[in-house]
């Protein structure tokens, strides 16, 4: 980063400083800058850069990209696909994305190497100043929370030039924390993850494949070892359209054996059962797999302080149903931008309260249902009974896809919408912790559950 670039942003008070140029940070900066506010984005890495991800964009993400005017760029750099191929329990179903008044019936696959650079550049073109190679070290002039259930506040962030080690302060009226799943700034100001809520763990790599331009992304619901026994986890193969496929495995902390699972062995088991036509072998592998853990279901909080908001992965804004985070990064970044802009327009920080309300109304009930669902299907007997039976019906799995991808129609009480309402009505009456007792009763290893659960 040129030295004068840091000088230019440290000499004045800005409207907003956004920490992180990933999906939520770049989205927030795009919308704030588009509205004419003085925005500075600090990003530790230099974009483009590699980022561990499944590289899949659902119709929800495409809608946000279209609203930003960026779908043509993503379409040119990525690969369009039409739906999900579900594989499991001896069956294979091709499920097209549902027709929806607000979302397109297709998605894209595109590497985060390309995608994140497109969004960050868009924020810059809207007028945001984006400082690459600049690490946010700590909140500047941090103050403790004024009341329980709130984050602390800050007058900006102290940053460090990664290349030179020089430090400086970027001062701003509002601070948006979008620094990812391991949010250091969020923790410093009082954010913490609810450890009894789902945490995802995933591993992914790239392979050359003759099916790189397949029209469906593929999800494997059950993975089996060499003996045919079910092992905890799920797998995916996402065609990228450029000669490569993104291949990965995932696991949720709701599975009682997750701490003892070796993800490399899980990947090996998945590769062994993938259809040979994908040609996933040691000779077609393009490098070592990488992975990480992701908080889900808005499991991180508080998300709001006097002049601070948490957004995207930093807030745990990942769908527990399917592990999707990019769409919710764009959406929560936009929600944060709306709330911050309102506070700036009114000259009243109390207007920031709308952010919590917007998160709750947008995702509160849905993520609650999702948390209950993933708890249940982590029990093999429930998985066999529910998903195993569901795989016998294209009709049923198509409805389940609408629910899991959060693509329920607001204007129609169809079978998927009615099914979700019924599940939601039940979930409202069952406390999160109550499911643990039910699962323990189903588990032959019930006495060991309490001691193994974190």
What is each stretch, according to the model?
Residues 46-66:
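Conserved N-terminal glycine-rich FAD pyrophosphate-binding loop of Rossmann-like flavoproteins
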Residues 255-339, 345:
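FAD/FMN-dependent oxidoreductases across multiple families
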Residues 8-22:
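Beta1/beta-strand and adjacent pyrophosphate-binding region of the FAD-binding site
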Residues 62, 67-116:
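A conserved beta-strand/loop capping segment in the N-terminal third of enzymes
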Residues 33-53:
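Glycine-rich FAD pyrophosphate-binding loop
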Residues 341-454:
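C-terminal helical "tail/cap" subdomain of flavin- and related membrane-associated enzymes
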Residues 25-26:
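N-terminal Rossmann-fold NAD(P) dinucleotide-binding loop
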Residues 122-278:
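Predominantly flavin-linked oxidoreductase catalytic cores and closely associated redox partners
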């Amino acid at each position: 980063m040129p030295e004068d670039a840091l000088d230019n942003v440290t000499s004045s008070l800005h409207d907003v400083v956004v920490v992180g140029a990933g999906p939520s940070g770049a989205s927030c900066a795009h919308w704030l800058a588009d509205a004419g506010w003085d925005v500075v984005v600090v990003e530790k890495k230099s974009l483009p850069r590699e980022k561990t991800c499944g590289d899949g964009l659902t119709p929800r993400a495409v809608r946000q990209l279209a609203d930003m005017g960026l779908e043509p760029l993503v379409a040119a750099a990525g690969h369009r696909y039409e739906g999900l191929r579900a594989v499991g329990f001896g069956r294979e179903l091709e499920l097209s994305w549902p027709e929806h008044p607000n979302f397109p019936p297709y998605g894209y696959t595109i590497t985060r190497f390309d995608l994140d650079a497109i969004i960050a550049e868009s924020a810059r073109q809207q007028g945001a100043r984006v400082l690459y190679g600049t690490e946010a070290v700590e909140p500047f002039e941090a103050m403790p929370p004024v009341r329980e259930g709130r984050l602390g506040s800050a007058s900006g962030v102290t940053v460090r030039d990664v290349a030179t080690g020089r430090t400086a302060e970027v001062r701003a009226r509002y601070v948006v924390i979008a620094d990812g799943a391991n949010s250091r700034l969020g923790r410093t100001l009082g954010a913490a993850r609810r450890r009894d809520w789902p945490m995802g763990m995933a591993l992914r790599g790239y392979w050359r494949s003759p099916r790189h331009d397949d029209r469906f992304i593929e999800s494997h619901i059950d993975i089996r070892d060499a003996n045919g026994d079910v092992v905890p986890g799920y797998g995916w193969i996402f065609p990228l359209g450029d000669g490569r496929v993104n291949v990965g495995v995932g696991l949720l902390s709701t599975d009682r054996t997750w701490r003892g699972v070796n993800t490399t062995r899980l990947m090996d088991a998945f590769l062994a059962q993938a259809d040979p036509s994908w040609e996933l072998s040691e000779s077609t592998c393009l490098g070592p797999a990488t992975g990480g853990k992701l908080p889900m279901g808005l499991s991180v909080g508080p998300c709001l302080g006097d002049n601070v908001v948490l957004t995207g992965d930093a807030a745990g804004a990942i769908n527990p149903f399917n592990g999707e985070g990019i769409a919710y990064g764009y959406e929560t970044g936009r929600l944060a931008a709306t709330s911050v802009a309102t506070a700036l327009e009114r000259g009243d920080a109390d207007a920031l309260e709308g952010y919590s309300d917007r998160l709750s109304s947008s995702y509160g009930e849905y993520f609650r249902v999702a948390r209950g669902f993933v708890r249940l299907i982590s029990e093999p007997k429930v998985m066999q009974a529910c998903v195993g039976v569901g795989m016998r019906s294209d009709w049923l799995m198509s409805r389940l896809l609408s629910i899991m991808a959060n693509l329920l129609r607001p204007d129609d009480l169809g079978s998927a919408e009615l099914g979700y309402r019924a599940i939601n009505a039940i979930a409202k009456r069952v406390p999160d912790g109550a499911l643990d007792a039910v699962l323990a009763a189903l588990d032959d290893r019930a006495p060991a559950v309490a001691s193994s659960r974190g």
